[in-house]
Every structure is written in structure tokens, then in C-alpha cells.
């Protein structure tokens, strides 16, 4: 081997060793934060989390090729890993306002806690060998929300089923774990449907655990995060997080899902502007206008005026117009209760039970 070839070989070897050392450092740093979060949330008694190597992830996504990008704003890729289709989530520092590593580890930790439930996007494992941990999840499709393609619009039966199953998932977060977990970002982009038509809730980066014996957590106004048009007023204005934070967001989701009065889906706000400031500046927030409009239409008996015609057609000719109105009014009245526009705000378990009842109506 001549001197030139030897020099080239040494450089490649040095670069390879440097990359391996860096990945090992990331693995240790990321693993430490993840372990701390698991201990905080469940005293370390969590399900085992499978880890994948960086090489496996890069091969599965073709080096994170844009052609495999499923959701651009939160960097979700499709891939093939160990002979099965998967979704691979790779966040970046500028996706979140702050604490990116902690948020990604929270996503992994909560996902591992709920993966046994069919209505959550199942975590298959993670990779800690990148600067930001990468999640590997079962493959599912995003729900076609507010699509301009009429062929992709979901029929009534599918919409009510998805709504019911997401309500069940949120109720599970609130009641079935060792500590009450508040999702804080229930919105369409975080909902998937698998090949069997089962709805899956995902993305727990902003999930907040309420301490044992407490019913709320309060964060500083500049720490309020989420999707603006789905934020509960109290949370946006004061930083107070309760179970009703999710109930409100779910109510807005129902309103957007069953009418053609769509809200605007915003990503997290810019680093130099808090959601509190953005909320305060936006005096007639979209979800308030939607709820008020729905309330007015219900009172005036004009429900059909705000419904998606394709969805109405999908309810079938065997149903009378009166029966269709009854079912839709029940859903919309439930949504208004969730947003505080009609009577007492229900808990998510009650919401799930009511949606089951509406689904069974014949």
C-alpha cells in the first residue's frame, strides 16, 4: 500500500471512529434523559423499549429521503425495518419552543406506557444514536382531514368510530395510568388510522403528568404550547392544565370533524412569541367562532347548513332526515358541552360513553 492510499485509509478510519464515538455519546446522553423520564412517570416500571441502530434507521428511510416523508412539519417518515412497514419520527431542535430532548424522551416514555392499548400508535422502539432520539412506530395512515379530494372524505360511520376511539384513548390517559396524563395537543395531525380502520392517538411530546393527589398543573404563560385553535381558553390565558384542557380540545376536534367549518391548524408559535401573547392578540379565536356558530345553528334548527354534504350522503338512504338530524345534533351538542358552551363540561370517560351510544343508534 503506497503512502497516498495509506493516508486515505487512515482518514476514513479516523472519520468512522469519530462517528462511532459521537453516536455512543448521543446514546448515553439521550438514554440518561429517557431513563429519568421513565422513573418520574412510572417509577422505572415500564415496558422494555427496543433500540435500533443508526444504520438500521438510515437504511429504512434511505437516509431520511424526502421521498419517504409522510408528514413534513413533524418529520414523520415511512420505511421498511426488519421486513415490516413502519413510521419513523425524527424531530429537530427548531420544531419545539424549548427542551427538545426532554420532549422527545417524553414522547418515547408515554408511548411505551400506552403501546398495549389498540387506540394508540404503537411504539416499536427507538434509536438513541442521533443527536435527537428517533421513534419507530407501527405503520398507519393519517386521517384525511379537511382534504380537497372528495373521494378521500370519510363517511359518517368512520368519523363517529374514529371520534369514539380517540375519546377512549384520551380517557385512558386520564384514568388508567399511575398518574393522570394530559395530552395537551389533541388535533387532527396527531390521529392515525391503521389498515383495519382502528384510530390511533399519537405524539406525546407535550404530555403533562399531574402529580398524585392533585387535579391540575400550572405552567408559566410563556411555557404554554400546543395547536392554537385547539387550546382551552384557561390554559392559553393562565397556563393551568387540567383534564378539561383535553376535553376542550376534543370538543373542537369534534366540531371540525363533523362540520365543514374547519379551524386553522397552527404549528407551535415562533421562538420569540408565546402562545399566550398570540392568543391574547387573536380576540375572536377560530374555535370560539366555530362553537358560537354551531350553537346558533343548533338553536335555529339549521344543522344541515353546516354539515359536509358527502358525510350526509354516507349516512344512508335507510335513515330518515329526522333520524340523521337527531344523531348529528347529539354529536354537536356533545361538542358544545366539551367546549363549555352547553351545561357542565363532561370528563373524557363520559364523552367516550356518549359517542358509543350515538354510534349504536339505529
Curated annotation (Swiss-Prot):
Superkingdom as given in the UniProt entry: Eukaryota
The UniProt record lists the keyword ATP-binding: yes
Disulfide bonds: none
Region: Disordered, residue numbers: 1-23
Keyword Cytoplasm on entry: no
Substrates-to-products reaction catalysed: L-seryl-[protein] + ATP = O-phospho-L-seryl-[protein] + ADP + H(+); L-threonyl-[protein] + ATP = O-phospho-L-threonyl-[protein] + ADP + H(+)
One Pfam family matching this protein: PK_Tyr_Ser-Thr
Alphabetized UniProt keyword annotations: ATP-binding, Kinase, Nucleotide-binding, Transferase
Protein EC: 2.7.11.1
Class of the enzyme per the UniProt entry, highest EC level: transferase
Residues that hold ATP according to the record: 41-49, 89
GO annotation terms (biological process): cell surface receptor signaling pathway
Span of domain Protein kinase: 35-362
GO molecular function: ATP binding; protein serine kinase activity; protein serine/threonine kinase activity
Annotated GO CC locations: cytosol
Residues of the active site: 185
Similarity comment text for this entry: Belongs to the protein kinase superfamily. Ser/Thr protein kinase family. ZRK subfamily.
Protein name per its UniProtKB record: Serine/threonine-protein kinase ZRK4
Organism listed in the record: Arabidopsis thaliana
